[in-house]
Amino acid sequence: MSKEKTPRALKDNEAKAVARMLRISPQKLNLLAQLIRGKKVERALAELEFSRKRAAFDVRKTLESAIANAENNHSLEVDDLVVAEAFVGKALVMKRFSPRARGRSGKIQKPFSHLTIVLREVAVAAQA
């Protein structure tokens, strides 16, 4: 009995890519989303390439997918793209049990995340 989802309509100068069910916790993935938010796509790709975080590969793949969507589906100029939004949502949490001493059990939680990246084409001011 949750509210109806209202999808955010993309503007003409925007493109989006979504990665669902990434096997990493939302808190860890959000660190990388904060890293690329508001940056030009070339800079964001460079930062992700040299990041030592495990999720950097998944974020980079999603960003490259958003760039391809912008270029092929929306006919946007790749050099003018900026990461307008990069946000993380919680997905399901798989619960497992690990046997412990004296017949007890410990709870293991394996969280999943959704990653959404929205790119926006920003007009470059004319050089005089």
Swiss-Prot record:
Protein name, entry field: Large ribosomal subunit protein uL22
Keyword annotations from UniProtKB, A to Z: Ribonucleoprotein, Ribosomal protein, RNA-binding, rRNA-binding
Function: This protein binds specifically to 23S rRNA; its binding is stimulated by other ribosomal proteins, e.g. L4, L17, and L20. It is important during the early stages of 50S assembly. It makes multiple contacts with different domains of the 23S rRNA in the assembled 50S subunit and ribosome.
Family matches, as Pfam families: Ribosomal_L22
InterPro entries: Ribosomal_uL22, Ribosomal_uL22_bac/chlpt-type, Ribosomal_uL22_bac/org-type, Ribosomal_uL22_CS, Ribosomal_uL22_sf
Gene Ontology BP annotations: translation
Keyword ATP-binding applies: no
Family: Belongs to the universal ribosomal protein uL22 family.
GO CC term (a single one): cytosolic large ribosomal subunit
PROSITE patterns linked: RIBOSOMAL_L22 (PS00464)
Gene: rplV
Subunit structure: Part of the 50S ribosomal subunit.
One GO molecular-function entry: structural constituent of ribosome
Keyword Magnesium attached: no
